[in-house]
């Protein structure tokens, strides 16, 4: 009996290390807590120790992530699946990963994200889905991600955002949707992420400013709309988050005009990019008070007294944007900061309250 017990113990001593061994051709560190299988020709998810916290499977070949693909590694905190030729992520693919914080799915061929794909990822904070072929976000897809902070969806093929697209992701703060095929943001599409602080929408196909969708946002500090075919910015465009907005990109949009009250409620703006557009004026309400940088080049500026606010701001700055007048003709080519066109302009007088309407 004692001999049988001894043999059993010896067998277990041999078997257990084998079960928890580092996968072939991989590198493991920290008592198998970090497993690195970068570009080793894998075609299925390897078996690793259940104590593994970081699993790097970059540059392998997993066309479909089936349900329960990672059920044996419940303690994962960081999962790297970049460049793995993934086409589809099935419902329940990450089931059981209740401690996962970082998920990298960048640079794949993902076209389909099934509803339920992110089930159980209640601690996920950083999700990278950039450089794929995702064309839509099914309603409820992100519902389990109650702690999501950063979502990178840039360089995909998303055409529109519908109501409920971000349902459940109430803590999302940074959202990147650059270089998609967006033509519209439907009203209600951003209602669930009103706490966004950084929102990048550059290099899409937005032909009009999405006022209704953006009006639900409350604390946007950085908004990027560069390289969209926008022609005008309407009244109250930034009002819902005007007390927080610090950086605004509107360069390379073919922008022709701002409505007079486009910047209503904007009080903290510090950096504005307006280069390579078709602007000839700025609205009289443009918020210069806290402005630190302003790029203006390659616009057909009309150097009349409507630019007096810009002139005053330029005179107070040591580093000045190098923009030039296009008209009137006698001032064409002169730098806005040097031209005589604005020297005689007087500040507008405030209308007496008695003269106002009653």
From Swiss-Prot:
The LRRCT domain extends over 299-347
Q: Which GO terms describe its cellular component?
A: extracellular matrix; extracellular space
Q: Where is the composition biased (Basic residues)?
A: 348-358
| A Pfam family annotated for this UniProt entry | LRR_8
Q: Where is the signal peptide?
A: 1-20
Expression by tissue, per the entry, reads: Present in femoral head and rib cartilage, as well as in tendon. Detected in bone marrow.
Stretches assigned to the LRRNT domain = 21-50
- Which subcellular locations apply to this protein? Secreted, Extracellular space, Extracellular matrix
Glycan attachment points: 143
| Annotated segments matching region Disordered | 321-358
Q: Name one GO biological process term.
A: bone development
Cysteine-cysteine disulfides: 22-37, 303-345, 305-325
Q: What does the UniProt keyword field contain?
A: Disulfide bond, Extracellular matrix, Glycoprotein, Leucine-rich repeat, Repeat, Secreted, Signal
LRR repeat residues: 51-72, 75-96, 99-120, 123-144, 147-168, 171-192, 195-216, 219-240, 244-265, 268-289
Functional note: Promotes attachment of chondrocytes, fibroblasts, and osteoblasts. This binding is mediated (at least for chondrocytes and fibroblasts) by the integrin alpha(2)beta(1). May play an important role in the regulation of chondrocyte growth and proliferation.
> What is said about its interaction partners and assembly?
Mostly monomeric.
Q: In which family does this protein belong, per the annotation?
A: Belongs to the small leucine-rich proteoglycan (SLRP) family. SLRP class IV subfamily.
PANTHER family, per the entry: IG(IMMUNOGLOBULIN) AND LRR(LEUCINE RICH REPEAT) DOMAINS, TIR DOMAIN-CONTAINING PROTEIN
User: What is this protein called in UniProt?
Assistant: Chondroadherin
Q: What is the lineage of its organism?
A: Eukaryota, Metazoa, Chordata, Craniata, Vertebrata
Encoded by which gene?
Answer: Chad
């Amino acid at each position: 009996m004692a001999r049988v017990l001894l043999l059993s113990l010896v067998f277990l001593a041999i078997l257990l290390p084998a079960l928890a061994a580092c996968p072939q051709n991989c590198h493991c560190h920290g008592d198998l807590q970090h497993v690195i299988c970068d570009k080793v020709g894998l075609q299925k998810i390897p078996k690793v120790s259940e104590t593994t916290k970081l699993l790097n499977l970059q540059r392998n070949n997993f066309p479909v992530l089936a349900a329960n693909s990672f059920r044996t590694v419940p303690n994962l905190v960081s999962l790297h699946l970049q460049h793995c030729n993934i086409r589809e992520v099935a419902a329940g693919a990450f089931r059981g990963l209740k401690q996962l914080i970082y998920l990298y799915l960048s640079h794949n061929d993902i076209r389909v994200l099934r509803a339920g794909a992110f089930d159980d990822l209640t601690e996920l904070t950083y999700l990278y889905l950039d450089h794929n072929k995702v064309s839509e976000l099914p309603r409820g897809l992100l519902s389990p991600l109650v702690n999501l902070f950063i979502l990178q969806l840039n360089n995909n093929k998303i055409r529109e955002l519908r109501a409920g697209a971000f349902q459940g992701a109430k803590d999302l703060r940074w959202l990147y949707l650059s270089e998609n095929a967006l033509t519209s943001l439907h009203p209600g599409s951003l209602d669930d992420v009103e706490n966004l602080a950084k929102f990048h929408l550059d290099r899409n196909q937005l032909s009009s400013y999405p006022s209704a969708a953006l009006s639900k946002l409350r604390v946007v500090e950085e908004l990027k709309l560069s390289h969209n075919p926008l022609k005008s910015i309407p009244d109250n465009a930034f009002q819902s988050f005007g007390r927080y907005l610090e950086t605004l990109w509107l360069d390379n949009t073919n922008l022709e005009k701002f409505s007079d009250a486009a910047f209503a409620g904007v009080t903290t703006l510090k950096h504005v990019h307006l280069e390579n557009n078709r602007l000839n004026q700025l609205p009289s309400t443009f918020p210069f008070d806290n402005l630190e940088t302003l790029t203006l080049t390659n616009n057909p500026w009309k150097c009349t007294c409507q630019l007096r606010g810009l002139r005053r701001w330029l005179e107070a700055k040591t580093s000045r944007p190098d923009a030039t007048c296009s008209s009137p003709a006698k001032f064409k080519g002169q730098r806005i900061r040097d031209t005589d066109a604005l020297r005689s302009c007087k500040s507008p007088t405030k209308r007496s309250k008695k003269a106002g309407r009653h």
